[in-house]
């Protein structure tokens, strides 16, 4: 493995500036779910120029693509994302909330880094395949719409991963370690009520209020929260409350629900009950209701064999060396965070490493930027979040790591994270992830026994818990509304 590590390290460092430029360019063009046309084409064209065969519009998603190099088996996928979040515009390298354009998008989850690291890993693996004449195929999967869109779930449904043997990915974080916990499955759907408009004072008896129906539905689901499993969550947002005039009986209103639980069977059960509440609200108000199923994703299925292999690579490369300017800026960011922010970050670190993880987290209460890799341990913990990587993980073995791109304590989906996502701190963490994924991919090419063990572990679970795509066939990906 030492020879592999040296080769991968040299290959990625040789193109360091190119990769940081690409990450920054995607940061400069923040696009939300299923509208990442610039970012997708930027990566696809660069991979095409590097000698990959690129297939666009995969899974009937215009900004999803596959870039492939090599021949035959095994086929190893590197999963890249590039979507941003609405309303998180923020100047880079600024330790106070200062938007570039108020109300516009921003990379609040570091997906400019996520996609570029997978891109860099794919290039490095291609160089290794060319250098050593090794058989096998490396693929970069351009996956849009992770943030609230479940792009990979749609792609799984359309069969684009059917011939893949294993997949690797990562996520930017404040620490280095393994993403080794289960996640929450979810369903997102909206209910649109239609009533009859009327003068709210002169003839309210002639109106039928869609807004009343939404209010009754949210009241009903709030009571439902008392009668669902403890780890389930039901969130909602009223996306249309009708016209802005209060003296009109509202003829239209809409509410969006996001339902989460550790298992999809529980999510589906709660979803069915929420749908009944919507029907009841329509009945009580003499309105009509229409449900629009938006998206869903399954829980994440860890693969311990593949995680161990990836952890070995991550541990070899280790955390980046930080200079005084980076540490000073990270301290400025930390000064804007609450003690609860820092504690939540430490809790996330602890959750990945068992008892050793708890000790590790306590030792790093005052750490500014991660300076060692967190311990790894197989765990039954469930992360209170969702990812469409989950659906890929039920089709084939998947492993993913975290890499330090932000000051310890930085919460996801915040201006602080956007600000750090275009700095040398983020770049160093991104390249660590790229090296880790590339070295693990090469290891899978060389060690057929390792790959077979990963697949056997996966099959042991899926033989008794077969995968069913949670998104109905008639549902198509939709941009953020």
Describe every region a protein language model picked out.
Residues 77-79, 88, 194, 401-404:
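Non-cysteine beta-strand/loop elements that form the S-adenosyl-L-methionine
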Residues 2-107, 112, 116-137:
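Acidic/His- and Gly-rich active-site-bordering loop/insert found
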């Amino acid at each position: 493995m030492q020879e592999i590590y040296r080769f991968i390290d040299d290959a990625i460092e040789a193109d360091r500036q190119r990769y940081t430029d690409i990450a920054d360019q995607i940061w400069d063009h923040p696009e939300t779910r299923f509208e990442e046309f610039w970012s997708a084409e930027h990566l696809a064209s660069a991979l095409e120029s590097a000698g990959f065969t690129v297939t666009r519009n995969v899974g009937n998603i215009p900004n999803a693509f596959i870039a492939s190099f090599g021949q035959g088996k095994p086929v190893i996928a590197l999963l890249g994302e590039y979507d941003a979040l609405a309303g998180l515009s923020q100047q880079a390298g600024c330790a106070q909330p200062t938007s570039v354009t108020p109300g516009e998008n921003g990379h609040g989850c570091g997906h400019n880094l996520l996609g570029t690291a997978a891109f860099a890993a794919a290039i490095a693996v291609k160089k290794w395949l060319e250098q050593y004449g090794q058989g096998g195929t490396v693929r970069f999967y351009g996956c849009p719409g992770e943030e609230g869109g479940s792009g990979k779930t749609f792609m799984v449904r359309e069969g684009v991963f059917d011939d893949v043997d294993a997949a690797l990915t990562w996520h930017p974080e404040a620490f280095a370690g393994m993403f080794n916990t289960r996640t929450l499955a979810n369903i997102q759907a909206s209910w649109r009520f239609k009533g009859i408009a009327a003068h709210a004072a002169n003839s309210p008896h002639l109106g039928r209020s869609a807004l009343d129906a939404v209010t009754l539905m949210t009241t009903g689901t709030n009571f439902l929260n008392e009668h669902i499993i403890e780890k389930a969550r039901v969130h909602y947002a009223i996306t249309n409350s009708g016209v802005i005039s209060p003296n009109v009986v509202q003829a239209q209103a809409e509410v969006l629900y996001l339902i989460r639980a550790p298992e999809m069977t529980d999510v589906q059960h709660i979803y069915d009950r929420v749908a009944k509440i919507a029907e009841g609200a329509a009945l009580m108000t003499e309105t009509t209701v229409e449900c629009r199923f938006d998206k869903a994703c399954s829980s994440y299925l860890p693969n311990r064999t593949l995680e161990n292999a990836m952890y070995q690579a991550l541990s070899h490369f280790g955390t980046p060396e930080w200079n005084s300017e980076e540490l000073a800026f990270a301290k400025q960011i930390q000064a804007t965070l609450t003690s609860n922010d820092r504690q939540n970050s430490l809790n996330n670190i602890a959750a990945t490493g068992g008892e050793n993880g708890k000790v590790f987290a306590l030792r790093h209460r005052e750490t500014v930027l991660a300076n060692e890799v967190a311990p790894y341990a197989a765990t039954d913990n469930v992360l209170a979040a969702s990812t469409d990587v989950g659906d890929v993980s039920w089709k084939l073995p998947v492993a993913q790591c975290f890499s330090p791109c932000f000051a310890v304590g930085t919460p996801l989906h915040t201006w602080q994270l956007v600000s750090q996502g275009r700095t040398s701190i983020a770049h160093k963490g991104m390249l660590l992830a790229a090296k880790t994924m590339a070295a693990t991919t090469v290891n899978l090419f060389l060690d057929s026994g390792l790959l077979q063990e990963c697949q056997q572990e996966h099959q042991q679970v899926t033989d008794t818990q077969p995968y069913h795509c949670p998104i109905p066939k008639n549902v198509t990906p939709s941009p953020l509304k």
